[in-house]
């Protein structure tokens, strides 16, 4: 499932084609994805101009001029691609035009857009149909069930060591499962938690509360972890995300941060920490694979 860097990569790729474009037609290939489309979904969107593309955690936000926002989740296999309208010459805005790379029978949503002199299609493809699109009033986004209790973004100023100390204090739960709690940090997933903990030399099995002093202040290790979380997310976004299973960027290319994985999916490989000499291990926590080096992550 795409994590925050993958969704941010998609947002950045779609923005040149979608922002400022008018939705001439919205084609739905079926009545539902994971959930049914909202009633009169196409009718509520056609004729509207897209004013901006945003993101909250792992959700893409397509904001329309009339105060409605399309909340889109990619699910397990969803992806967007951008193509010039059939019969039109030239490339789509942002130079993201490319030949079809996915089976057309899984093209479930097609935005036919007018942007200046250009006509472009933005196509949502989802073989497993685990993604979804909802319509939400922009001024009620904070009340949307998936957003109501989300923690701060790992890329924003709200994420600080002091904040994490306030959430970790007294917690006996393992550090990894605590970081995966979307109520604490929004958008962090399995891959990037494993990588951040390795960079901070912290065991995913360690109790989260041990990183907080008896006075409720962050220990030096928690200050460092906060920085490492920011760093790993920034590095992944710069690399275009990680192309595991079905994720592709909007220009059809694959992200390449997976080539920089230090521990994730590296079971049995030598630890990359200089001078460590340990081996990456895999354990299962709450039904999910955790990768770490027991020799240097304490």
From Swiss-Prot:
SMART domains: Fapy_DNA_glyco, H2TH. Its EC number is 3.2.2.23, 4.2.99.18. Its cofactor is Zn(2+). DNA binds at residues 106, 128, 171. GO terms for biological process: base-excision repair. Keywords: DNA damage, DNA repair, DNA-binding, Glycosidase, Hydrolase, Lyase, Metal-binding, Multifunctional enzyme, Zinc, Zinc-finger. The active site is at 2 (schiff-base intermediate with dna), 3 (proton donor), 58 (proton donor), 288 (proton donor). GO terms for molecular function: 8-oxo-7,8-dihydroguanine DNA N-glycosylase activity; class I DNA-(apurinic or apyrimidinic site) endonuclease activity; damaged DNA binding; zinc ion binding. It comes from the Bacteria. PROSITE patterns: FPG_CAT, ZF_FPG_1, ZF_FPG_2. It catalyses: Hydrolysis of DNA containing ring-opened 7-methylguanine residues, releasing 2,6-diamino-4-hydroxy-5-(N-methyl)formamidopyrimidine; 2'-deoxyribonucleotide-(2'-deoxyribose 5'-phosphate)-2'-deoxyribonucleotide-DNA = a 3'-end 2'-deoxyribonucleotide-(2,3-dehydro-2,3-deoxyribose 5'-phosphate)-DNA + a 5'-end 5'-phospho-2'-deoxyribonucleoside-DNA + H(+). A zinc finger (FPG-type) spans 262-298. Binds 1 zinc ion per subunit. Monomer. Involved in base excision repair of DNA damaged by oxidation or by mutagenic agents. Acts as a DNA glycosylase that recognizes and removes damaged bases. Has a preference for oxidized purines, such as 7,8-dihydro-8-oxoguanine (8-oxoG). Has AP (apurinic/apyrimidinic) lyase activity and introduces nicks in the DNA strand. Cleaves the DNA backbone by beta-delta elimination to generate a single-strand break at the site of the removed base with both 3'- and 5'-phosphates. PANTHER family: FORMAMIDOPYRIMIDINE-DNA GLYCOSYLASE. This is Formamidopyrimidine-DNA glycosylase. It comes from Agrobacterium fabrum (strain C58 / ATCC 33970). The lineage of its organism: Bacteria, Pseudomonadati, Pseudomonadota, Alphaproteobacteria, Hyphomicrobiales.
């Amino acid at each position: 499932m795409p994590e925050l860097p993958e969704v941010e990569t998609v947002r950045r790729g779609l923005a040149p084609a979608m922002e400022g474009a008018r939705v001439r037609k919205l084609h739905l290939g079926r009545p539902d994805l994971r959930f049914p489309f909202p009633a009169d979904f196409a009718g509520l969107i056609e004729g509207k101009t897209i004013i901006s593309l945003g993101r909250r955690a792992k959700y893409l936000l397509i904001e329309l001029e009339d105060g409605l926002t399309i909340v889109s989740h990619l699910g397990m296999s969803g992806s967007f691609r951008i193509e010039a309208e059939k019969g039109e010459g030239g490339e789509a805005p942002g130079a993201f035009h490319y030949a079809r790379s996915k089976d057309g029978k899984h093209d479930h949503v097609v935005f036919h857009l007018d942007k200046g002199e250009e006509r472009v299609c933005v196509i949502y493809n989802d073989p497993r149909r685990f993604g979804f699109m909802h319509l939400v009033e922009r001024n009620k986004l904070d009340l949307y069930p998936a957003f109501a209790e989300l923690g701060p973004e790992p890329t924003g100023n709200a994420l600080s060591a002091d904040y994490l100390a306030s959430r970790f204090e007294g917690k006996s739960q393992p550090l990894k499962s605590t970081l995966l709690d979307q109520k604490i940090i929004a958008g962090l997933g399995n891959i990037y938690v494993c990588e951040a903990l390795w960079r901070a030399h912290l065991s995913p099995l360690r109790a989260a509360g041990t990183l907080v002093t008896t006075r409720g202040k962050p220990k030096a290790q928690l200050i460092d972890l906060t920085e490492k979380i920011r760093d790993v997310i920034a590095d992944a976004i710069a690399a275009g995300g990680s192309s595991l299973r079905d994720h592709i960027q909007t220009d059809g290319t694959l992200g390449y941060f997976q080539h920089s994985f230090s521990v994730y999916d590296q079971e049995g490989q030598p630890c990359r920490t200089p001078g460590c000499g340990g081996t990456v291990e895999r354990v299962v926590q709450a039904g999910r694979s955790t990768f770490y080096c027991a020799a240097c992550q304490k």
